[in-house]
């Protein structure tokens, strides 16, 4: 294939039934192959993802060449996100409004352009419990992905958006376009020297500049702690390094904040779904996210398999079967503690209290960091301590086993050894505790797996 002349070193000889790829310059450090090849391998699809280094003057030729040679789909990155629109047979309305395309999908006669950055970031925010409806937002910077961020804010119903930028005209151009799209004034441009004109309040703060990418970078704007303390949540679109000066400032101020890795993840997932007309499961999405983390930051956990989740999720049943299948040792942390203490869990609760028991759990996890080749089933309350959930991710890959309330109740209603269910209405207790703990479990795990809609073998296949 002639298009392979543009493949970067290491990819020239890639073969598959279908090719996917990305056009950009420079492109050698892209992480997109991690996303898409992980998906193809997991789904059993004969597709391979190739980075292509394409110069500006070759863009039109390469888009036509890729289509003629059957390339299934393409991502587009800098510097081509705007100019590529001239080569397409159609452009999605969101991409037109944003003025940038990052995904090409085969249609009759050529490619159609989409922008998955915007919905990718929206999905990333959703997973962090951040809703944009009626939100007030401060955007720092008006370059790069800022147009997609502003479009996302307007599309998802933000009440007010301030774009702070050193070059006022650039921020104003985005504000004008987004307000025209909204049909009302939602977005306001603010020159960086006028940042104090933003009313006091609490804002979702999104860092859209490239400041923080390089060692020695400072804050995107030197506005002082009082300004950044207006953030009630922070997002930095940069994902490498994992902790930018902006994110460190958020941490210092006690503001919950995340980097841009999940945006990278979800924009890639959405592109893959468009190319293949399928839906990627949350379990597979989590596996791709873990692969990205390993590729960027390095693997920082043991080879054990750790199972967390609410009582009745199947941690013991799945854990024992999986350990047998893999030839691993099976460890149940509750039984481990009972053996150490010489009494049952209910007795520990009754005689020494829950706080004492939770401390025992923490000590057990510290011991288990030295173990290898184990499947570890944890007590339902063990990940509730932040210290415990952090330690678990050092022990091994953490899987959150999930089941709905009806399934859970059916599994545990006859159990007499569960202290937390010794109440008048155990079903209501289950519902309340699952709601309370669900987000904690999700943050404590690497990968989510449902155990209420498949066989034991199918559940084990999702894990290993």
Residue ranges and their predicted role:
Residues 6-130, 241, 247, 253, ...:
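Phosphate/diphosphate ligand-binding glycine-rich loop within oxidoreductases
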Residues 24, 115, 125, 134-155, ...:
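Glycine-rich adenosine-cofactor-binding loop
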Residues 237-301:
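Adenosine-phosphate binding glycine-rich loop
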Residues 333-393, 418:
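ATP-dependent small-molecule kinase phosphotransfer cores
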Residues 394-438:
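A glycine- and Lys/Arg-enriched "phosphate-lid" helix/loop adjacent to the NTP-binding pocket
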């Amino acid at each position: 294939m002639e298009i392979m002349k543009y493949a970067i070193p290491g990819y020239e000889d890639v073969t598959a039934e279908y090719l996917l790829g990305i056009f950009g310059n420079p492109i050698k450090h892209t992480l997109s192959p991690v996303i898409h090849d992980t998906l193809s391998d997991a789904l059993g699809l004969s597709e391979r993802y190739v980075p292509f280094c394409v110069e500006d003057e070759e863009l039109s030729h390469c888009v036509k060449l890729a289509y003629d040679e059957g390339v299934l789909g393409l991502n587009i990155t800098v510097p081509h996100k705007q100019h590529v629109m001239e080569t397409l047979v159609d452009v999605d309305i969101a991409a037109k409004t944003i003025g940038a395309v990052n995904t090409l999908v085969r249609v009759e006669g050529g490619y159609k352009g989409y922008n998955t950055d915007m919905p990718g970031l929206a999905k990333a925010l959703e997973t962090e419990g951040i809703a944009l409806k009626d939100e007030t937002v401060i955007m720092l910077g008006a370059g790069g992905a800022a147009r997609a961020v502003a479009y996302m804010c307007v599309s998802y119903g933000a009440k007010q958006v301030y774009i702070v930028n050193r070059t006022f005209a650039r921020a104003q151009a985005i504000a004008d376009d987004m307000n025209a799209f909204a049909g009302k004034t939602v977005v306001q441009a603010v020159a960086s020297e006028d940042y104090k004109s933003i009313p006091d309040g609490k804002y979702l703060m999104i860092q859209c500049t490239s400041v923080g990418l390089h060692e020695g970078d400072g804050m995107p704007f030197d506005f002082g702690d009082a300004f950044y303390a207006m953030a009630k949540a922070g997002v930095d679109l940069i994902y490498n390094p994992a902790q930018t000066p902006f994110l460190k400032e958020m941490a210092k101020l006690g503001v919950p904040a995340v980097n841009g890795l999940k945006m990278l993840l979800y924009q890639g997932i959405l592109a893959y779904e468009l190319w293949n007309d399928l839906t990627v499961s949350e379990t597979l999405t989590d596996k791709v996210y873990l692969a990205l983390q390993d590729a960027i930051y390095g693997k920082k956990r043991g080879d054990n398999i750790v199972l967390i989740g609410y009582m009745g999720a199947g941690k013991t049943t799945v854990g024992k079967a999986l350990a047998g299948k893999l030839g691993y040792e099976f460890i149940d942390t509750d039984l481990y503690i009972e053996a150490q203490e010489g009494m049952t869990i209910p007795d520990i609760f009754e005689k020494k209290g829950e706080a004492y028991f939770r401390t025992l759990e923490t000590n057990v996890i510290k011991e288990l960091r030295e173990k290898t080749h184990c499947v570890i089933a944890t007590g339902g309350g063990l990940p509730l301590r932040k210290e415990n959930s952090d330690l678990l991710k050092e022990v091994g890959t953490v899987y959150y086993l999930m089941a709905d309330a009806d399934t859970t109740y059916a599994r545990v209603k006859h159990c007499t050894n569960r202290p937390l269910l010794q109440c008048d209405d155990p079903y209501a207790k289950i519902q309340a505790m699952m709601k309370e703990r669900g987000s904690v479990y999700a943050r404590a795990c690497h990968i989510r797996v449902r155990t209420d809609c498949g066989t034991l073998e199918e559940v084990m296949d999702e894990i290993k």
